[in-house]
Amino acid sequence: MQEVVLSLLVLLAGLPTLDANDPENKNDPFYYDWYSLRVGGLICAGILCALGIIVLMSGKCKCKFRQKPSHRPGEGPPLITPGSAHNC
């Protein structure tokens, strides 16, 4: 019984593919020109990559590597000096 139901479901799931339109039908509202889309995406990616390299090389963007390193906890002035604890 389960095999019959499973085969019926597979048949019903596959029926819409038999009625599918020709992918080269240019009048179809769901026809996509994949070549133009791919070329446009590559051009856009190339422009964004070039702009990113220009911004990094221009020097206007201050990177964290050029800043002075922060003080370490051991290098700061001592909070408790000798003899200051008895003044509380």
From Swiss-Prot:
The chain crosses the membrane at residues 39-59. Residues 1-38 are extracellular. Glutathionylated. It is found in: Cell membrane. GO terms for molecular function: ATPase binding; ion channel regulator activity. The keyword rRNA processing does not apply. Residues 1-20 form the signal peptide. Residues 60-88 are cytoplasmic. Expressed at high levels in heart, skeletal muscle and liver with low levels of expression in breast, brain, lung, stomach and colon. In the gastric gland, mainly expressed in the mucus cells forming the upper part of the gland and is absent from the parietal cells. One of its GO terms (cellular component) is endoplasmic reticulum membrane. Associates with and regulates the activity of the sodium/potassium-transporting ATPase (NKA) which transports Na(+) out of the cell and K(+) into the cell. Reduces glutathionylation of the NKA beta-1 subunit ATP1B1, thus reversing glutathionylation-mediated inhibition of ATP1B1. Induces a hyperpolarization-activated chloride current when expressed in Xenopus oocytes. This is FXYD domain-containing ion transport regulator 3. It comes from Mus musculus (Mouse).
